[in-house]
Amino acid sequence: MRRGDTFNRRSRPGGSGTKRMSIYSARPVKLDKVRTYPLASRSSKVSVADFARVARRGANVREWVDSLPRILAGETFRAVVTALERARRKRKPIIWGLGGHVIKVGLSPLLIDLMHRGYLTAAAMNGAALIHDFEIALIGSTSEDVPAVLGEGRFGMAEETGRYLNEAIVAGDRAGDRAGNRDGLGVGEAVGRFLNQKRPPLRVGFRPYSLLATAYRERVPVTVHEAIGTDIIHNHPAIDPRALGAATHRDFLLLAALVRDLDGGGVYLNVGSAVVLPEVFLKCVSLAANLGRAPRGITTVNMDFIQHYRPTQNVLVRPTATGNSGRNPSRGYALTGHHELMVPLLAAALEK
């Protein structure tokens, strides 16, 4: 028997007289009855009208932004710029939630400029941002080489950082008692006050670079949200856990009031905090809803070099879900990129 005859006989599992190469019983579909339609009748998501334009030589930043594609991140960036400019015109809060990296990559001068221009009306910090800002105010530098000192037990043990931050917080907590009022100061206001003393216990040589110091002078609220055990000042003998807890709770209540006022066009930006500030912001929204109404018609923005779960859910999705209908719906936008590039670009794109 020929080899070919043997192969063909094995390839007829259904007993059909038609010779097939495949051993499978299922047969491929036929395309002769597929229905098509004219290309021009289709709804398409991309058009040449949305394409990038070549910016003219010597174009300013606004012209360059206008030249970006009106697609995906290009359109998202434009939408964030528009929301910030609209909030400033309407005198609505623009709150920046700041993680530690935002401060330690050198963006304080831009944040201070945004404050003076009306694009930062309040700031919320995690404990790392507080520490970096404080160290910059004192000596003009920050950020330890952790692997180099961790094994020696030296990580986080700088005397001035631990002692004077804790003492500032304790003094702020006790200020209420001296004033005949049980309410002391929050962490942000207490540290801002410390940095602006006429006769501080140590030299504050780089005060103009401190967001906390500048905000205090300008009466711009800064709140600090501590999670016990996450920051180096919690290792220092000068810590008063009761004062720290009370002060950071005051800051939470202050931020809740600021978040409530976002209603009707305010903007909240979470920049570089993956866990603490997104969780705090969500609780502020819930508290506002419980005491009256969740803020509606707001814009939330998450800026980071990776889009994490909690910022996505707790900043962009959940807080905007309660106000995403009507004439002025809430919106959430993700801008992905390095802080040291994205924040300067956003600051430059905003109208003066």
Where are these regions (language model features)?
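Ligand-binding beta-strand-loop-alpha-helix segment within the catalytic cores
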Residues: 144-219, 223-224
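Short acidic, glycine/serine/threonine-rich loops at helix termini
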Residues: 106-110, 134-142, 234-238, 280-283, ...
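C-terminal functional extensions of proteins
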Residues: 254-257, 264-267, 274-352
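A generic, well-ordered mixed alpha/beta core segment in the N-terminal half of proteins
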Residues: 106-172
